[in-house]
């Protein structure tokens, strides 16, 4: 990755013209194939399906808002909630809930 020295946005390589281009401010900088190869290499591409389970490993839940919703596992009536974009950008985001009592996490399907 390379960032624009003028505006700080991500620069993209234009390999045909052999330059780095900032799509925000238009700044250009020469591209060196040998030196810049690692900056443009995709080392791992991860693709997710919309129905995959998403697990929040560590998060300070006390900072999340709570709402009145029934936990499908224990019946508790309060859960933390957060919103994430899990599908394409033109589709609605997904709301996740985590029970304040048992910790069970589920998503809302609207």
From Swiss-Prot:
A cellular component annotation (GO) from this entry: chromosome
A Pfam family recorded for this sequence: Zn_ribbon_TFIIS
Residues involved in Zn(2+) 2 binding: 71, 74, 99, 102
GO molecular function, one term: zinc ion binding
InterPro entries given in the database record: DNA-dir_RNA_pol-M_15_CS (IPR019761), Rpa12/Rpb9/Rpc10/TFS (IPR012164), TFS (IPR006288), Zn_ribbon_RPB9 (IPR001529), Znf_TFIIS (IPR001222)
Keywords: Chromosome, DNA-binding, Metal-binding, Transcription, Transcription regulation, Zinc, Zinc-finger
Compartment annotation: Chromosome
Binding-site positions, Zn(2+) 1: 4, 7, 22, 25
Gene Ontology biological process terms in this record: DNA-templated transcription; regulation of DNA-templated transcription
Phenotype when the gene is knocked out: Essential, it cannot be deleted.
Annotated family: Belongs to the archaeal rpoM/eukaryotic RPA12/RPB9/RPC11 RNA polymerase family.
Entries under NCBIfam families matching the protein: TFS_arch
Name listed for the protein in its UniProt record: Transcription factor S
Gene: tfs
């Amino acid at each position: 990755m390379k960032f624009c020295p003028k505006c700080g946005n991500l620069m993209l390589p234009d390999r045909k013209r052999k330059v780095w281009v900032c799509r925000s401010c238009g700044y250009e900088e020469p591209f060196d194939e040998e030196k810049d190869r690692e900056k443009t290499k995709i080392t791992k591409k991860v693709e997710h399906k919309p129905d995959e389970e998403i697990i929040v490993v560590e998060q300070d839940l006390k900072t999340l808002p709570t709402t009145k919703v029934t936990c499908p596992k224990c019946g508790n009536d309060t859960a933390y909630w957060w919103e994430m974009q899990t599908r394409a950008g033109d589709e609605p985001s997904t709301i996740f809930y985590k029970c304040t009592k048992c910790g069970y996490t589920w998503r809302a399907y609207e």
